[in-house]
C-alpha cells in the first residue's frame, strides 16, 4: 500500500475514533508527528499563554503565571524520577495545559481527576483554579506537583514502551498507573492499610472498563493497589524489573506470562505475596 493509501486509512480511523471530520492535512500532521490536536485542545491552547521548557510546551492563563517556575521545577523532578526508573528515552514534544475541572473532565471522560494524559494527543491536562494559586504556592505537592509528577510518568512510560517496539494496550492499567503513582509519591510518606480496602484481582483492573468500574466502588482504591504492586516489584526485584517487563512483553508473550517468568509466580500467587509483604 502506498503512503497515500496508508494516510487515507489512518484518516478514516482517526475520524471514527474522534467523531470528527479531519482534513487530509490534519491527518498527515497527526500521523507524522504522532500528535493529534482535538478541537477542545486547539481551543484551550488558543486561549492560553505559552512557555517552552525543553520538550514541554506549557499552556497557562495569565492568572496562573506565578505557577510557571514551580511547573518547570516539577517537570525537572518528574524527568529525574522517570528516567531513574526507566532509563533513557527519546524526549518527544509534549504539551501541558492548565485547565478547569469541566474541560479536564471532557478530555479525560473521568470524574474527580486532577490530571490527565493522552498518549494519542500527546497532552497532559492539569486542573488549576485561579482562586487556588496562592494555596498551591503554600502547599505545592498535594495541590499541584503530584498530578504533574503522575502524568509526566505516564508520558515517560509510554515513550519507553514505544521505543521497545510494543504497544501500550499490551500492558495492564495497574502497571501503568502504579509506575505513575510511584513517581508521584516521591518524597511522600505513603500511608496504607491493606485491610482498609477491598483488594481486587489484578486482572480485573487490567483494562479500561474494569478500571473505571473499580474507581466507582467506595470500598476499593485501584490507584493505591497499583502503587503497592509496583512498589513491591521494585523493592523485591529492583528498579530494573520495570524495564525488563516492558522490553519482554510483546504480541506473542503477554505481560502476565512475562511477569510469571520473572517473579516465578502466577498472577494469583503474586497478588498474595504483595499482600503478605505489607501485612
Model-derived segments and their meaning:
Residues 47-164, 255:
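Juxtacatalytic substrate-recognition/specificity segment
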Residues 1-49, 279:
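N-terminal low-structure segments adjacent to metalloprotease catalytic domains
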Residues 143, 147, 163-279:
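Acidic/His/Gly-enriched intrinsically disordered linker/tail segments
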Residues 42-45, 108-112, 194-200:
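Alpha-helical scaffolding within the catalytic cores
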Residues 35-37, 68, 78-83, 273-279:
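Charged, low-complexity, helix-prone segments enriched in Lys/Glu/Asp/Gln
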Residues 39, 43, 134-135, 222:
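Hydrophobic alpha-helical segments with strong N-terminal bias
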Residues 4-6, 133-134, 178-183:
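N-terminal short leaders/motifs
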Amino acid at each position: 500500500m502506498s503512503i497515500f493509501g496508508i494516510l487515507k486509512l489512518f484518516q478514516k480511523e482517526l475520524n471514527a475514533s474522534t467523531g470528527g471530520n479531519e482534513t487530509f492535512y490534519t491527518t498527515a500532521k497527526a500521523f507524522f508527528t504522532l500528535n493529534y490536536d482535538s478541537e477542545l485542545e486547539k481551543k484551550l491552547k488558543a486561549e492560553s499563554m505559552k512557555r517552552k521548557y525543553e520538550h514541554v510546551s506549557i499552556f497557562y492563563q495569565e492568572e496562573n503565571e506565578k505557577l510557571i517556575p514551580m511547573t518547570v521545577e516539577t517537570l525537572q523532578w518528574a524527568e529525574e524520577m522517570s528516567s531513574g526508573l526507566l532509563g533513557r528515552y527519546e524526549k518527544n514534544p509534549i504539551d501541558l495545559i492548565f485547565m478547569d475541572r469541566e474541560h479536564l473532565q471532557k478530555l479525560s471522560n473521568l470524574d474527580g481527576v486532577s490530571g490527565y494524559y493522552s498518549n494519542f494527543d500527546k497532552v497532559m491536562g492539569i486542573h488549576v483554579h485561579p482562586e487556588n494559586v496562592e494555596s498551591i504556592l503554600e502547599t505545592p505537592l498535594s495541590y499541584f506537583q503530584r498530578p504533574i509528577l503522575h502524568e509526566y510518568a505516564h508520558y515517560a512510560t509510554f515513550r519507553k514502551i514505544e521505543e521497545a517496539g510494543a504497544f501500550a494496550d499490551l500492558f495492564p492499567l495497574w502497571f501503568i498507573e502504579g509506575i505513575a503513582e510511584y513517581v508521584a509519591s516521591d518524597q511522600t510518606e505513603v500511608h496504607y492499610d491493606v485491610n482498609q480496602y477491598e483488594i481486587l484481582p489484578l486482572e480485573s483492573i487490567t483494562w479500561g472498563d474494569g478500571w473505571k468500574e473499580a474507581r466507582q466502588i467506595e470500598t476499593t482504591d485501584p490507584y493505591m493497589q497499583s502503587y503497592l504492586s509496583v512498589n513491591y516489584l521494585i523493592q523485591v526485584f529492583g528498579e530494573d524489573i520495570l524495564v525488563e517487563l516492558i522490553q519482554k512483553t510483546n504480541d506473542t508473550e503477554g505481560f502476565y506470562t512475562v511477569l510469571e517468568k520473572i517473579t516465578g509466580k502466577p498472577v494469583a500467587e503474586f497478588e498474595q505475596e504483595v499482600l503478605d509483604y505489607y501485612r
